[in-house]
């Protein structure tokens, strides 16, 4: 850490890197929203068109950006402690306590991040279903909808792990079929949640 702070250039480089990647993740949220729209339409028996991918740019992008900011903040804030710990000298990290602390912190941050992402996972669907809903309302409704259903969605995610491993054997080509299948499954999960609530 001391070498990082003794070299102001590296601090600025890290800040620029995180700022740019944060902005990219927010911008990609608009495309994720369009992708969600495509799979929700498909699950409802409607025919999607290519322009649906850009639906987030047309339909009140400020709400979508606010939700994307929340998702990005969850990701970046939970990765920050692990990142800062990884800046420690290798001698400190490789001793017994350093490695244990690093591993423990990584697991804790991953679990918290996963729980938060599962909690707010239905936000884009809610923004699509309720055009007058604000970003804050969508996040709150998602939290309420996912009470008691996080385990079910986590189980669905786990069922895709073996298929992802098979996709590794195809050098990622299998993902061309797996990713749409996963997204359609999640859209159907949302429709099932709506029926239950």
Kindly give the residue locations of the regions a language model identified:
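Hydrophobic alpha-helical membrane segments
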Residues: 1-197
